[in-house]
Swiss-Prot record:
InterPro entries hit by this protein: AKR, AKR3D, Aldo/ket_reductase_CS, NADP_OxRdtase_dom, NADP_OxRdtase_dom_sf
Keyword NADP in record: yes
Organism, as annotated: Hypocrea jecorina (Trichoderma reesei)
Protein name: D-galacturonate reductase
EC number(s) from the headed UniProt entry: 1.1.1.365
Domain of life, per lineage: Eukaryota
Family: Belongs to the aldo/keto reductase family.
Keywords linked to the UniProt accession: Carbohydrate metabolism, NADP, Oxidoreductase
Record GO biological process: D-galacturonate catabolic process
UniProt binding sites for substrate: 109
Reaction(s) the record says it catalyses: L-galactonate + NADP(+) = aldehydo-D-galacturonate + NADPH + H(+)
GO molecular function, one term: oxidoreductase activity, acting on the CH-OH group of donors, NAD or NADP as acceptor
Length: 309
């Protein structure tokens, strides 16, 4: 039977499927969050950088008023790159917007520091238009702030996002608290097997974002995806979302359309033959140098991902 939740390295349970809120438009997020929680979603993934946490908070409030209990859901937010040396301040901003006393998981959004005193709260730039990066920042120092905020009770878990094996290898020897989660872009055209395997070895749970690739992604019509969908009588979307849960990862499905939000809760068991088809597809892309990463902000930094190094 397909998993509905996974146990983190701190003993807490994280749902297998969550609602993602990245790039969800203003005016649509509140209803999406409220509806999702009322039909059975248990995980809401957000971030300060997304600029819509006020609306996420309104959706949470509406769902709570309709009978959803705070203790039954799992809320994720992320510290943006201009706040990596001001973690408490960054978290407090998110908590105010969300209308919560705590989140269940706080992530480092990217292991980079953008100038906290720059010309923009989120995306400071230099006169030449490049991102205003603080080059001597050590992400291990930022993690120490994450560990400190964990002790305040304002978050139940801490983790990272967009961390490569290289960056985790730099972090782990200095970590008192091992990250509970690494949230990464993940789909059959970017399986990131190296980091997935490394995280499993270290007890770090994977959360997959952009599981369909991107809007209009060729993944939806890729031969193995279509073949499995036809065999099982399900949609290509269901195949791609189920791929992650069958790998032991939590998957974030993003939509503001009620019918799609509901459909994205459907996760099915994929057998060994199905997974082999998808893995062979990934391996073929890798052998041809055609792996596709859709999310890579222009920080000008090598984060250590093999497909970008």
């Amino acid at each position: 039977m397909v998993a509905t939740s996974f146990k983190l390295n701190n003993g807490l349970e994280i749902p297998a499927v969550g609602l993602g809120t990245w790039q969800s438009k203003a005016g649509e997020v509140k209803a999406a969050v409220s509806y999702a929680l009322q039909i059975g979603y248990k995980l809401i993934d957000g971030a300060y950088c997304y600029g819509n946490e006020d609306e996420v908070g309104e959706g949470l409030k509406e769902a709570f008023a309709a009978g959803v209990k705070r203790e039954d859901i799992f809320v994720v937010t992320k510290i943006w790159a201009t706040y990596n040396t001001r973690v408490v301040l960054g978290l407090d901003k998110s908590l105010r917007s969300l209308g919560l006393d705590y989140v269940d998981l706080l992530l480092v959004h990217w292991p980079v520091l953008l100038n906290p005193e720059g010309n923009h709260d989120k995306f400071p730039t230099l006169p030449d238009g490049k991102r205003d990066v603080i080059w001597d920042y050590n992400h291990v120092d930022g993690w120490k702030q994450m560990e400190a905020v964990l002790a305040t009770g304002k978050t139940k878990s801490i983790g990272v996002s967009n961390y490569s094996k290289k960056y985790l290898e730099q972090l782990l020897p200095h970590a008192t608290v091992i990250p509970a989660v690494n949230q990464i872009e993940n789909h059959p055209s970017l399986p990131q097997q190296e980091i997935v395997d490394f995280c499993k070895e270290k007890g770090i749970h994977i959360m997959a974002y952009s599981p369909l690739g991107s809007t209009g992604s060729p993944l939806m019509s890729a031969d193995p995806v279509v073949k499995i969908a036809e065999k099982k009588g399900i949609s290509p979307t269901t195949v791609l979302l189920s791929y992650h849960v069958n790998r032991g990862s939590t998957v974030l499905a993003k939509s503001v359309t009620p019918a799609r939000i509901k459909a994205n809760l459907e996760i099915v068991d994929l057998d060994d033959e199905d997974m082999k088809l998808l893995n062979d597809y990934s391996n073929d892309l890798a052998s041809k140098g055609e792996l596709k990463r859709y999310v890579y902000p222009p920080f000008g930094i090598d984060f250590g991902f093999p497909d970008k190094s």
